[in-house]
């Protein structure tokens, strides 16, 4: 599997690419290509063009969850496909938890997708997945994450609307991740980890049956985090003994320093290319 970072909060020296506070990764695996999230804007299109990546050739877009910094780029992708006359008969799969495109609010401000999922039906085929979904033989969408650790994934972020139209606390149940399975272990890729980074890793291990974690890449939702939670998260990763962690996006410097005492931390930024056999 090859992973290229198209959107992150940071970019690297001498890459001359554009960063924004969001997530978008391009994946190549098993003869297929994917986008994992789409960032806030059209930045991912700009960066993909510079890196020689043709996003019109992707097989699927995978949405980690419905927040705006992961979904708003979908509108720009649809506009781009329209401009290049992408055939509407060859629809791109749009894989997400069923709740991902429900309205989301924080302090009366919309923080969810800027259009309902049906608005993208010209170019995308919606795949609602609450359970595990095989993207390829070796790449899995985890669906709704089990939350068993009592120190994470327990608090709502604003409000959402349920299937009956009632406003409820948003525990971001749509937050998911993907996992690459290989002969030497698993690679876990996250968006924001609102469900809890340790919960995600635990669930990936449960679903795959493989405790050999090669890498965890993405947002860990460790931003202005209490020291007690950081300590428990660091202890978890120390016990996990993963080969490498690539914390980024919603992971602040304090969290990275804490994690560095427990695991091998690697740099992430727009333009980074990671290869896993």
What is each of the regions a protein language model found here?
Residues 32-34, 59, 91-92, 186-187, ...:
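Short active-site oxyanion
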Residues 123-127, 138, 261-268:
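Active-site regions of enzymes building and remodeling cell-envelope glycoconjugates
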